[in-house]
Amino acid sequence: MTQSKSNPNEQNVELNRTSLYWGLLLIFVLAVLFSNYFFN
């Protein structure tokens, strides 16, 4: 937390990485739901 002031770019990279992981998780969940819908 203390390094966020000295290096704000690092914090932005972490934020983008977190949003990317959430996006991939959302796509994965939607893919599973759609596959279950089509197979059933």
Curated annotation (Swiss-Prot):
GO biological process per UniProt: photosynthesis
InterPro entries: PSII_PsbL (IPR003372), PSII_PsbL_sf (IPR037266)
Membrane-topology descriptor: Single-pass membrane protein
Any one cellular-component term (Gene Ontology): photosystem II reaction center
UniProt-annotated location(s): Plastid, Chloroplast thylakoid membrane
Keywords for the protein's UniProt record, in alphabetical order: Chloroplast, Membrane, Photosynthesis, Photosystem II, Plastid, Reaction center, Thylakoid, Transmembrane, Transmembrane helix
Main location: plastid
Transmembrane segments: 19-39
Purpose: One of the components of the core complex of photosystem II (PSII). PSII is a light-driven water:plastoquinone oxidoreductase that uses light energy to abstract electrons from H(2)O, generating O(2) and a proton gradient subsequently used for ATP formation. It consists of a core antenna complex that captures photons, and an electron transfer chain that converts photonic excitation into a charge separation. This subunit is found at the monomer-monomer interface and is required for correct PSII assembly and/or dimerization.
Family: Belongs to the PsbL family.
Self-association state and partner proteins as the record states: PSII is composed of 1 copy each of membrane proteins PsbA, PsbB, PsbC, PsbD, PsbE, PsbF, PsbH, PsbI, PsbJ, PsbK, PsbL, PsbM, PsbT, PsbX, PsbY, PsbZ, Psb30/Ycf12, at least 3 peripheral proteins of the oxygen-evolving complex and a large number of cofactors. It forms dimeric complexes.
Name of the protein described by the UniProt record: Photosystem II reaction center protein L
